[in-house]
Amino acid sequence: MVMAANIRCRLPLEGIIRASMATKAPVIYEIAKSELGYTEFDPMSFVEFVVTENDRLGNTSVPFAIHGDHITVKKPEEKGEVAELIGAELAAGFTTFAIDCSHMENDPNLAATLDLAQPVVGAGLGLEVELGEIGAKSGSAEGFTQPDEAAWFIEGLSKGGIHPNLLAINNGSIHGTYFGTTHEGIQLELTKKIWQAIQPWKVDIAQHGITGTSLDKITQFIHHGIRKGNVGTFWQNISFGLAMNQNGNALTTAEKHYIKRPYRGVPDELWAKMWKWAEETGNTGGNIKKANKAFADELNAVGKEFKERITLQAYEEAIRLFEATNSAGLAGEVVAILTA
């Protein structure tokens, strides 16, 4: 299983790269279509940043991928805009793509995915598709993807000449922070049944929404067909210096206010400024993520002391995740596959 890290600001990347090099763990660096709207990055600058940092840190032996996460289509008329984004990410050097039409019903999802996947498949690059909107609360089994649906979807793609590597599903995870009494609820037995249902096409599972999941549970993912695991909000928590529980979920008050640790992350003064902005602009709760763009210049300019403590925490936590995902030491195997 390979960890995928969503990079919303520049601060945690060095620690993740250093951990990847130390453990010989391949890693996927990714950014979602939505994140391109609330971070400083566009497709080209994202690739340039990731590649430049790997070069600067001397990574010459541990492979990494650059992934277009959640390239989302919510309705058919958005396909043209999304096709342009796929083209821009192809031109920038992205190596894998997650085409996400899961907000639509199954039939239009299949049709849109078949269409949008063509340039990715034509370029011989990696493809992830999605069935069942992540975090959905309505529909069959409260929105959970079902094995028969998954088999129908992958078979339909295959008949259309599209053979994805990974299927993202709704199996009980959410994106972002678990607030209040909500808690992590990834259904591993359902996940395994879905994986088994799509094995005739040799497709594996991509697990979204890992932030807030225990390391013990993550170690079980590989036994349930999961081969890629997305971690995003966790790195933001580290960068902002937020208090977290043992599973990496941010600790919050009843009003969804975060708790800043004075010895973690960005300077307290910068966090206070960010939170004031969030309150004034209606971006509290999960929308604090939008501070990544609004405060990009100040985040990039934090002093050495703060950058180093973010790097150190990201390094240690990335090592734990590489170990839990069983990806430590896999670099050689990946290189052998890529060069065969």
What is the predicted role of each segment?
Residues 75-86, 212-225:
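Catalytic cores of alpha/beta
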Residues 43-47, 78-79, 102-125, 180-195, ...:
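Active-site-adjacent beta->alpha loops and helix N-cap segments on the catalytic face
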Residues 2-7, 27-31, 62-70, 95-99, ...:
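Hydrophobic faces of well-ordered beta-strands that scaffold small-molecule active sites
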Residues 93-107, 173, 224-243:
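Glycine-rich phosphate-binding active-site loops on the catalytic face of alpha/beta enzymes
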Residues 7, 103-111, 133-152, 211-215:
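Active-site glycine- and acidic-residue-rich loops that bind
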Residues 275-340:
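C-terminal extensions of enzymes
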